[in-house]
Amino acid sequence: MSSQTRVRVLSLYKRVLRSHQILPVDLKHLGDAYVKVEFRQHKTAGAKFVEEFCTQWESYASDLESKESSRLHDINIT
């Protein structure tokens, strides 16, 4: 894995864990554990696979972040 790819994956890993902050505690712990296992298992994956792996996790993180943004927006309105 190139150093540029490594930085991308590490940044994504941190982003996903940060996005779990909005989840209830029990789901956060479950999600964090799952993310750690997934990223650890795919440490040695080929470049082609890493691209798809990152795309899927970026989509997941974006989804959680949009839900958080929506939730914060709803709180500010009411």
Enumerate the language-model features and the residues they cover.
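Intrinsically disordered, low-complexity, basic-enriched segments
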Residues: 1-78
